[in-house]
């Protein structure tokens, strides 16, 4: 998917032009303050490039799930304030995303100004990709930039619908980066390629495991999903999480890996607990010796070492999903060990593919050491699965 990008637009293309830019400002908020502004900062390179080239930037985003009606708690007021701070200039915030107020605010904009529209999901036409709503959103602008990778897997009015009314429609720098690393790792990786897949359920990672079996040399599995694989091997897993209806699938995935010559590694030891609780009693046991009534909540130290050795010669590593219940200190060591191993691998391309593994890496302060940290959860997974993302397909080809 080689798409036209903001970088290809010159000052003469943009000067005085009104640009509708879709960003992903769906940031975590607690007690009336933003707890992590990564997504806001991720949009800055595109916003700054547009304003420096003399464009009038009209920002749009969703926030939370207001289900098509106004929800006072889900207004973008805090986002507007933080944007003004990090951009070092006033960002005017509208109380709607379509209509008279928007039209008159945009009419007063000067070159280089930035305006933030209200939460697009206050209208059901956003998630319904209603052409009339998309047309109204687009009506105030001359061209379109999508830099919201986190929602690129959704065909919504602000990610897909508006492209029918605005030309050119191009990718921002964030989407360009995401495609370069994620698409690059799938289409033309430096080999050997390893994928580390974690998380609690096989069901949510089936697509990505199947797709990666066609691409990678090594597949390392961790997290709660491993117990479904152990059960498929006939092992006793105590009270560990098992998806009974996925046991046959686990067998077939192992068989497929063997058939394709992919090294598929599961942990050899696990940290088990007598209950799902931060204060639980714990012990480290071999996978053949999980006691009845106990549950596995992390990979063990021996497994972390085996995984580390397996990654030693890899030139590209994709990681999606934690190795254990890393939110609880007693079950965080496996995830921490993998994060540290990747941070130390300066001879390889390391891609942290969205979701909880990103949170773990950021918490440990290792983000800077990775080649790429994806801002998309579902979007990253779908791209790694080889699916086409509607928000990207809709953009102009190079």
UniProtKB/Swiss-Prot annotation:
| GO BP annotations listed | gluconeogenesis; glycolytic process
Transferase keyword on record:
yes
What highest taxon heads this organism's lineage?
Bacteria
Pathway info:
Carbohydrate degradation; glycolysis; pyruvate from D-glyceraldehyde 3-phosphate: step 2/5
**Residues that hold ATP according to the record:** 205, 296, 327, 354-357
- Gene Ontology molecular function terms on file: ADP binding; ATP binding; phosphoglycerate kinase activity
Which HAMAP family does the record associate with it? Phosphoglyc_kinase
Which protein is depicted? Phosphoglycerate kinase
**UniProt organism field:** Trichodesmium erythraeum (strain IMS101)
Lineage start = Bacteria, Bacillati, Cyanobacteriota, Cyanophyceae, Oscillatoriophycideae
Source gene?
pgk
């Amino acid at each position: 998917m080689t798409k036209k990008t903001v970088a290809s637009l010159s000052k003469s293309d943009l000067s005085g032009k009104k640009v509708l830019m879709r960003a992903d400002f769906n940031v975590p908020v607690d007690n009336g303050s933003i707890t992590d502004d990564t997504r806001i900062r991720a949009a800055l390179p595109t916003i700054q490039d547009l304003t420096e080239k003399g464009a009038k930037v009209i920002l749009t985003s969703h926030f939370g799930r207001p289900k098509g009606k106004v929800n006072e708690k889900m207004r973008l007021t805090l986002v507007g304030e933080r944007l003004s701070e990090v951009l070092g200039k006033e960002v005017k915030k509208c109380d709607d995303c379509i209509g008279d107020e928007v039209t008159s605010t945009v009419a007063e904009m000067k070159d280089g100004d930035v305006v933030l529209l209200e939460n697009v999901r206050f209208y059901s036409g956003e998630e319904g990709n209603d052409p009339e709503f998309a047309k109204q959103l687009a009506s105030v602008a001359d061209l379109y930039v999508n830099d919201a990778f986190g929602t690129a897997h959704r065909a919504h009015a602000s990610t897909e619908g508006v492209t029918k009314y605005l030309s050119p429609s191009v990718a921002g720098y964030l989407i360009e980066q995401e495609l370069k690393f994620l698409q690059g790792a799938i289409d033309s990786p430096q080999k050997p390629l390893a994928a580390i897949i974690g998380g609690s359920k096989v069901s949510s990672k089936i697509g990505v495991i199947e797709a990666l079996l066609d691409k990678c040399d090594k597949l390392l599995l961790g997290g709660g999903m491993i117990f479904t694989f152990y059960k498929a091997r006939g092992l006793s897993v105590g009270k560990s999480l098992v998806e009974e209806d996925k046991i046959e699938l686990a067998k077939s995935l192992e068989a497929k890996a063997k058939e394709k010559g992919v090294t598929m590694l599961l942990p050899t030891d696990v940290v088990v607990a007598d209950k799902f609780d931060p204060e639980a009693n714990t012990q480290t046991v071999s996978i053949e010796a999980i006691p009845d009534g106990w549950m596995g909540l992390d990979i063990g130290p021996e497994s972390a070492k085996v995984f580390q050795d397996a990654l030693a010669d890899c030139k590209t590593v994709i990681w999606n999903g934690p190795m254990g219940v890393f939110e609880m200190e007693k079950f965080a060591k496996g995830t921490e060990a993998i994060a540290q191993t990747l941070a130390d691998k300066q001879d390889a391309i390391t891609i942290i593919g969205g979701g909880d593994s990103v949170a773990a890496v950021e918490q440990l302060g290792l983000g800077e050491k990775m080649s790429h940290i994806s801002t998309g959860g579902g979007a990253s997974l779908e791209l790694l699965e080889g699916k086409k993302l509607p928000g990207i397909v809709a953009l102009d080809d190079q």
